[in-house]
Amino acid sequence: EEERICPLIWMECKRDSDCLAQCICVDGHCG
């Protein structure tokens, strides 16, 4: 398992389910 950097763009985050939670937090939408 390799650590992945999630995209900062929300539309891209939604496509990356493996990192969705992290992306949401990075984008300021944690919760």
From Swiss-Prot:
InterPro entries named in the record: Prot_inh_squash (IPR000737), Proteinase_amylase_inhib_sf (IPR011052)
Gene3D superfamilies: 4.10.75.20
SS bonds (residue pairs): 6-23, 13-25, 19-30
GO molecular function: serine-type endopeptidase inhibitor activity
Site residues (Reactive bond), renumbered to this chain: 8-9
GO CC annotations, alphabetized: extracellular region
SUPFAM superfamilies, per database record: Plant inhibitors of proteinases and amylases
Localization in the cell: Secreted
Keyword field: Disulfide bond, Knottin, Protease inhibitor, Secreted, Serine protease inhibitor
Similarity annotation: Belongs to the protease inhibitor I7 (squash-type serine protease inhibitor) family.
Domain notes: The presence of a 'disulfide through disulfide knot' structurally defines this protein as a knottin.
Function comment: Inhibits elastase.
Name of the protein in its database record: Elastase inhibitor 4
Organism: Momordica charantia (Bitter gourd)
